[in-house]
Design a protein with these regions (language model features):
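Noncatalytic, beta-rich nucleic-acid-contacting surfaces in large DNA/RNA-processing enzymes
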Residues: 1-688
Length: 688
């Protein structure tokens, strides 16, 4: 009724007690997601509406982690700052305090030194201890009275912001209501895509205009062709999609929620998949349990289902069930579930359930302490999953354009998004000062020989390192008056300095005006410094003809200036050498039977080590033909840590596994072949 969500809670059968109940003596917790690029606009709106003295952002307590503990303890003990920094940087995101001794030895420290022994002793003591106050990601407190009369306030480092010096737990203790003003990059991307589609169709196009059950979209999702799609673009989600095979909106709700630490730790994922594939019979001990778990085949996946089980099967009141929900997230920190154990077991056994079933339900509830997902959140996220998937499927050019303009967000870099779009027959045009705006744009194809129904994507000046928004605005405004004659004319009329002109030349954005990159760099270097003295004098000197760089050098220059290339993939140039090494491409692996020994190589684009994966690292490799997923078991991670962490070009010897659309290499040996890339700098994104 407020119009802030597209999800109908009644139609979706969402549990109202999850939001509010009679026994809850406090207002509900409210989270509202906004476009990440407009979040500051919303924050300033709140300050303007309620006043700086009645609205402020909550604090969060930043605690010591291993790296920060090493650096601060090292300073206190008088250790060399640079060596301490190197030690801290050598730690992987998964390293524990128990790994410090080995890292010390690797970085040239003497583990037996009294000072180093003191360092080793103090790190676990300091770990988890409060270090400083930081700003909450979006927790706003709005009060009727002046906040300074209730809580301590300080000015934030960022202009026009004020911070409460208490965290969310402190605020809850005094009964202050917090509203989370959160930023979601996909909202920016979707809004931008809809704007582009509306402009192209010359008619408004809204989320509501997207068909509800599009078979092509679900086909794409089931094949895990979801790079860039909200929530289901991670390795774990892409691995789950061909197994779960979503064919409806509610399937997407389950998909969003099931690949979470809660269901994984609670041993809910595999039983659900077996039942979905009709490999296991679905049985319910009672009609009450069936009413709560029927939609998820007898497996509790959502927080609301745990609350319903507590109410229907264990005799909890709505308020007690909500207290159980609150305790689930805190049980590891505060032991909050122990008081509920007896009540759950006794309540269920007194109603005829076996103690074994009751204990299993309690263990699954404990699993939700590892971040189980509310069905209401999953439903809202599933809508964004479907919308973004539909846009990627049917409007890939507009979707790519919007994604590039919404970065940074998600799992993938601009280069990876572009490579994926090209595999979907989207043509990307280079940055060009004669046509590019600040943002990337879409252009209708004027080449009638092309059969694609999609427009081209023109890269914007925002892709060029060293060019800011103000410089781009000056370029566009000057271009509106008359076309640029040459780079010097551009520099004069757009008031560009030497660094900005060099950035444009390095990115090949001046190609239309003065030829290839080397030629343009020479023109800029030889003439730009003279322009202030001889601004109105005609340039009579003829530039010498300079040979264009080789393709490999051009690709390296592209990555250095924009972190992407529209030329051939770097591995296309290396393919003859890789073939001599008997290394398979990604597309060749697709034709192999499961269980075959394979060897492949690719640029490392992503490393993931989920906390629920028992030390397993998932690596994504990219070559000119596609993507290869690699699974590295913990034993090999420990043995070849350096190759996993430092390789830009990683060669994997292993076993090919293929089950339907689920395909990956189980690594047996890793080799770092980064030297083959020379000075090419490629971006890898690491998640945990």
């Amino acid at each position: 009724c407020l119009g802030i969500t597209e999800i109908d809670p009644e139609r979706s059968n969402l549990l109202f007690e999850r939001f509010i109940s009679r026994e809850r003596n406090e207002p509900p917790d409210i989270d509202v997601d906004f476009e990440h690029q407009r979040r500051e606009e919303v924050i300033q709106y709140i300050y303007d509406k309620y006043g700086q003295d009645r609205a402020a952002i909550a604090a969060t307590v930043a605690t010591y982690r291993t790296r920060s503990a090493i650096q601060d303890i090292g300073k206190a003990l008088g250790l060399d700052i640079e060596r301490t920094r190197r030690l801290s940087a050598s730690l992987a995101w998964w390293d524990k305090t128990s790994d410090i001794s080995q890292r010390l030895a690797e970085n040239g420290f003497d583990p037996d030194s009294p000072v180093i022994q003191k360092l080793i002793q103090l790190i676990p003591v300091l770990y988890g201890f409060p270090r400083h106050l930081s700003q909450h990601v979006g927790g706003f407190v709005i009060s009727r009275d002046k906040l300074c009369r209730i809580v301590p306030i300080e000015n934030a480092a960022m202009a026009d912001r004020r911070i409460i010096q208490w965290d969310k737990d402190d605020l809850a203790a005094v009964g202050l209501m917090k509203i989370d003003v959160l930023a979601l990059g996909m909202l920016s991307a979707i809004r931008r895509t809809l704007d582009l589609v509306s402009a192209r169709r010359d008619a408004p196009f809204r989320i509501q205009d997207i068909p509800a059950k599009d078979e092509a979209t679900f086909d794409m999702i089931c094949k895990a062709d979801t790079i860039g799609v909200f929530q289901i673009e991670s390795r774990a989600q892409m691995s789950m999609l061909p197994r779960l095979k979503p064919r409806s909106f509610y399937d997407l709700v389950i998909e969003v929620a099931i690949v979470r630490p809660g269901p994984i730790q609670g041993d809910m994922v595999h039983p659900y998949l077996r039942r979905r594939q009709e490999l296991e019979v679905v049985e319910y001990p009672s009609e009450e349990v069936k009413s709560a778990l029927k939609r998820t085949l007898g497996i509790p996946i959502f927080q609301e289902q745990v609350m319903q089980l507590a109410i229907l099967a264990a005799g909890f009141t709505s308020g007690e069930a909500d207290q159980l929900r609150r305790s689930m997230a805190a049980w590891k920190k505060k032991g909050g579930l122990s008081p509920f154990h007896g009540k759950i077991i006794d309540g269920m056994t007194s109603r005829g359930y076996t103690s074994e079933f009751a204990e299993r339900i309690f263990r699954q509830i404990e699993g939700f302490g590892e971040y189980g997902f509310p069905e209401s959140h999953a439903a809202s996220f599933a809508l964004l999953v479907y919308v973004s998937a539909w846009l990627k499927c049917h409007e890939p050019a507009a979707f790519l354009c919007a994604m590039l303009n919404s970065l940074p967000m998600g799992f993938y870099s601009a280069s990876q998004l572009i490579q994926d779009a090209r595999r979907h027959d989207v043509r990307i045009m280079p940055v060009d000062v004669t046509v590019s705006d600040w943002d990337c744009t879409i252009e209708e194809q004027f080449d009638k020989t092309l059969q694609s129904a999609q427009p081209d994507v023109r890269l914007g000046l925002n892709r060029v390192k060293g060019i800011g928004l103000e410089a781009a605005k000056r370029i566009v405004e000057a271009r509106k008056i008359s076309p640029f004659e040459n780079p010097i004319d551009l520099a004069n009329r757009a008031s560009l300095n030497t660094a900005e002109m060099r950035a444009l030349a390095s990115s090949d954005a001046l190609n239309t005006l003065s030829g290839h990159r080397r030629q343009t760099l020479w023109v800029v270097a030889s003439h730009i410094k003279q322009r202030d003295l001889l601004r109105d004098a005609p340039i009579r000197e003829t530039s010498p003809a300079i040979t264009a760089a080789r393709e490999g050098e051009e690709i390296m220059a592209d990555y250095a200036s924009m972190e992407l290339t529209l030329r051939r993939h770097p591995l296309a140039l290396l393919r003859p050498e890789l073939a001599r090494m008997n290394l398979n491409s990604a597309i060749e692996l697709d034709n192999y039977p499961t269980g075959r020994l394979v060897r492949t190589t690719g640029i490392v684009t992503c490393r993931q080590r989920p906390g629920t994966a028992s030390g397993v690292v998932f690596v994504t490799l990219e070559d000119e033909t596609g993507i290869t997923n690699v699974v590295v078991w913990n034993q090999l991670v420990l043995k070849q840590r350096r190759e996993i962490l430092n390789s830009r070009l990683l060669t994997v010897y292993g076993v090919w596994q293929c089950e339907g659309e689920v395909k990956h290499v189980i690594a047996k040996r890793l080799v770092d072949h980064s030297h083959l890339l020379g000075n090419l700098k490629v971006e890898s994104r690491d998640f945990h």
